[in-house]
From Swiss-Prot:
GO terms for molecular function: carbohydrate derivative binding; glucose-6-phosphate isomerase activity; monosaccharide binding. It comes from Alteromonas mediterranea (strain DSM 17117 / CIP 110805 / LMG 28347 / Deep ecotype). This is Glucose-6-phosphate isomerase. InterPro entries: G6P_Isomerase, G6P_Isomerase_C, Phosphoglucose_isomerase_CS, SIS_dom_sf, SIS_PGI_1, SIS_PGI_2. The lineage of its organism: Bacteria, Pseudomonadati, Pseudomonadota, Gammaproteobacteria, Alteromonadales. Catalyzes the reversible isomerization of glucose-6-phosphate to fructose-6-phosphate. Signal peptide: none annotated. GO terms for cellular component: cytosol. Belongs to the GPI family. The active site is at residues 353, 384, 512. Its EC number is 5.3.1.9.
Amino acid sequence: MSVLTSLPEWKNLSDIAASVKSAHMRDWFAQDTSRADKMQLEACGIFLDYSKNRVNEDALKGLFDLARACKLETLRDAMFSGEQINSTEGRAVLHTALRNFSDRKVLVDGEDVMPEVHATLEKIEAFTASIHSGEHKGYTGKPIKHIVAIGIGGSFLGPKIMTEALKPHTVDAVKVHFVANVDGCHIHDVLSSIDFEETLVVMSSKSFSTQETLQNTLTAKDWFLKSGGTQEDIAKHFVAVSSNVKAATDFGISADNIFPMWDWVGGRYSLWSAIGLPISLALGFENFKGLLEGAFEMDNHFTTAPLEENMPVLLGLLGIWYRNFFDAQSHVLLPYYHYLRGLPAYVQQLDMESNGKEVTQEGESVDYPTGPIIWGSEGTNGQHSFHQLIHQGSGVIPADFMLPLNVPNQDDTHHAMLASNCFGQTQALMQGKSFEECYADLDGKGLDDAERKRLAAHKTMPGNKPSNTFLFDSLTPQTLGALVAMYEHKVFVQGVIWNLNSFDQWGVELGKVLGNQVLAGIQGEADKDNFDASTQQLIAKFRAANAPK
């Protein structure tokens, strides 16, 4: 038995869960008309209704007791103070420093990092202004109109999804094209549609050697040179976000156009850094800064609000409740706003890369479930497909619904219909429809009793399906920044409870190593005996299909 599962607070929650499982939320709402009023929170422009969760006062108290027993507050403060909480890599975890608008120093190995953070923001601001004003021109004197942002993982998802979500704030001066996958179809589609004389490539890779990112950048360089540019002209058309200055300058990028990255910022937390340069180029620096300001506001809420009134803490503990005491294997995100459709993919990486672990900080195997599968899609599309599983499937799938109360450029009818579907889904999941109600609906349909009962069983909706609902006045940069930071801190809370290192990703690293080894095999540069029989067979088929004809 692990330290966690032997805690009295854990055992207490097991007992409470056994009792709660026999209760139905619709009865709780009937018995307590103030339930919705009591189970709501508001922070940083985000309203949270968590009343449609399978928790009562005993469960909530038990969860907060567990958080304190796991020293959540102490570990939270350790992260913000720059302690090396990424124990396997010996690193501080300080993405929060990138959005620190206070006068507080942030020390890494005794050095205050804030001057460099501020200098980088100023550099992003100045570079953005030079592109938007037309001051920075291509080598033929034409202004830059297209940005090709090349990255992968956190250096791709964060900028792309933030830019999509804030599309109403897009500037007219440039168009940003995001490229990640090493599948050549994407980079070739992008490059074939733009003028090389009006294009700036932003290459984002801490090492300047990430396989997919480097290959796509080399392809862009080859396209640029074949189109008429020279090696000397690259300095006006390529910039880098990287800590490997030598590799970037050897490539042809001007040292003035290299933006820094730091070891104390993980990839999935990097949109707040110079990795966010494409966001600034797409939306303007003030809107990029607005993202940081919203995240900073959520940081302050997370570090100062009592646990019982702390939105990320509450969300993290609800996740623990369902994953560990209700065997919920996944969690679904349902943004009812088209521009926010990419958020599930962003949180998927954030959560699953952080807490997809099976050993504790001490290297011991866990004896409890950890990170859930994160998935989702925009509403109302999902209602016509996978919502069926959420409503009538055999497992528990907690859901996060989110909706802006006001949206740009829409008539009232569209948005009212969107909102009604969002709220209606949360009610249907909670309330369900009983067998008796379904049986009564079939009265007068010309069915015998056996057939009525059979059909009623199929139509029955059990309800008691948990959900959170997030509302915000409109999706501003500040609100989006707060929303993303909220999920970051939720993931941190769950990692603390599970005693995981949420800030490494050795599974990802292994994939990179093996990918390079297999590439050598495909290119005939590695002994086939280095690979298992199955992989040998796959390599052989690929080589045969691509052999010179």
